[in-house]
């Protein structure tokens, strides 16, 4: 079994890194989402092996409903909460990727363009990479497509 299979198997879910993201409502109530990283291998035909892994986030609410990335992002109000969710997802992906103990593959991250244009926010990301021991040259960032936005 490869390190990826071991990390992603449902039987191993107890060992998976999981974060909780909370969205507070005006009335003091709130919703919590358990965040988990999943990895899609990117294969090289020339190398005949995975050369990278695209990090994908999944959120699960208390009722067990699973949220795909766009649905999860829609649960966070624009502004600080959305920035916090993005930052939390990136940190979770880096921690989970490091657990694979793969020292040659790249990590592909999807980032909302609104967050990427605020470049000063990536300073903390560079620091987080340094603290995790993951070299920035092994990380690729993809700006996710926003349908219906003319300026993107």
Cite the ranges covered by each PLM segment.
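Catalytic core of bacterial c-di-GMP phosphodiesterases, primarily the EAL and HD-GYP domains
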Residues: 83-149
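Regulatory sensory/coupling modules that transmit signals to nucleotide-handling catalytic cores
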Residues: 1-2, 138
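Active-site core of bacterial EAL-family cyclic-dinucleotide phosphodiesterase domains
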Residues: 3-74
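A generic structural micro-environment signature
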Residues: 7, 41, 45-49, 65, ...
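Conserved protein-kinase N-lobe ATP-binding Lys motif
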Residues: 61, 75-80, 111-115
């Amino acid at each position: 079994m490869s390190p990826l299979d071991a990390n992603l198997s449902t039987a191993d879910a107890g060992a998976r890194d999981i974060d909780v993201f909370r969205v507070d409502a005006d009335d003091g109530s709130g919703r919590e989402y358990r965040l988990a990283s999943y990895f899609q291998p990117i294969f090289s035909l020339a190398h005949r092996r995975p050369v990278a892994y695209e990090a994908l986030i999944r959120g699960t609410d208390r009722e067990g409903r699973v949220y795909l990335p766009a649905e999860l992002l829609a649960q966070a109000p624009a502004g600080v909460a959305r920035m916090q969710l993005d930052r939390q997802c990136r940190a979770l992906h880096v921690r989970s990727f490091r657990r694979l103990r793969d020292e040659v593959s790249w990590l592909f991250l999807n980032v909302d363009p609104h967050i990427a244009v605020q470049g000063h926010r990536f300073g903390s990301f560079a620091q987080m990479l340094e603290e995790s021991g993951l070299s920035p040259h092994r990380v690729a960032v993809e700006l996710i497509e926003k349908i219906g936005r003319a300026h993107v």
